[in-house]
Amino acid sequence: MIEKDFVVEGLRRTRIDEYLEKELERAGYGGMDVQVTPMGTMVVVYAERPGMVIGRGGKTVRAITQKLKNKFDLENPQVEVKEVDVPELNPKIMAHKIAAMLQRGMHFRRVAYTTMRRIMAAGAQGVEVTISGKIRGARSATAKFTDGYIKKCGEPSVKHVREGFATVQLKPGVLGVYVRIMPPDVVLPDKVEIEDPRVTETPAEEASEASEVVEDLEEVEDLEEIEDLEEVEDLEEVEDLEDTEAEKKDADGEESEK
C-alpha cells in the first residue's frame, strides 16, 4: 500500500536523523535532508562545523556513508555537507547548546534568557524555549520562556516555525529542551503593510520646458511694462501741450484787454 510506503520512508528518515544527531553532536548538527535521485540517494547534512563532519582526509564522512548504506539500506548514498549560515537561527543547534550549558551546571533561567537574547539578536521574529524535568527539586516541572512574536497553531506554525529538541542527563534526572524559532524572512498571511505615498519627480525635459515657459512669461511682463511706460509718456506730452495752449490763450486775452 502507498500509505505504508510513506510511513516506512518517514520512519527511516527519522532513524537517519537520530543517528546523525548522535554521531555529529560535537560538530553542531543542524539537521539533514534526503533527496532521491536517479544516481542514488543524496543526504545533505547541515552542520555548524563542517570540518568535523568531513574528518581528516574524509575519514568521518566515508564512515557515515558506509553506515547509511549498510544500516539503513540506502541505495548508493552520497553525503554532502553544508555549513549553517546563522547557527543562532537553527533550533537544533541552539537546543544542544542549551543542553551543554545545563550539563555544565548553569541555572536554567540564565541559560534560557541568554540563548533567547542571542537568537533575537540574530534577527529572529520570535523564540520559545521550553525546559522540562527535575529543574527545581525532586518533582518534575516545566519552564517556558518566550520572546518576540511566534505562531502557536495553524498552517503558519507548521510551515514557518522551526523546531529543535535535545536531552541532557543530570544527577536529578533527564531534562528535555525544546526550542521553537520563527525566522526573520517569514511573511505571515495576515500581515498588512501601509506604503507611504509616492512622490513623482519631474523629468529633466519637463523641467526645462517649464523654465522656458517662465522665461517667456517674464519677457511678456517686461513688454507690458514697457508699453505702459510709453503710454504714460504719451499722456504726459499731451498734458504739456494742453498747458502751453492754455497759457497762450491767457496771454492773448490779456493783450486784447490792453
From Swiss-Prot:
Residues 16-85 form the KH type-2 domain. GO terms for cellular component: cytosolic small ribosomal subunit. Residues 198-258 are annotated as: Disordered. Gene3D superfamilies: 3.30.300.20, Ribosomal protein S3, C-terminal domain (3.30.1140.32). It holds the Pfam family KH_2. Keywords: Ribonucleoprotein, Ribosomal protein, RNA-binding, rRNA-binding. The keyword rRNA-binding applies. GO terms for biological process: translation. PANTHER family: 30S/40S RIBOSOMAL PROTEIN S3, SMALL RIBOSOMAL SUBUNIT PROTEIN US3. Part of the 30S ribosomal subunit. This is Small ribosomal subunit protein uS3. It comes from Methanothermobacter thermautotrophicus (strain ATCC 29096 / DSM 1053 / JCM 10044 / NBRC 100330 / Delta H) (Methanobacterium thermoautotrophicum). The lineage of its organism: Archaea, Methanobacteriati, Methanobacteriota, Methanomada group, Methanobacteria. The gene is rps3.
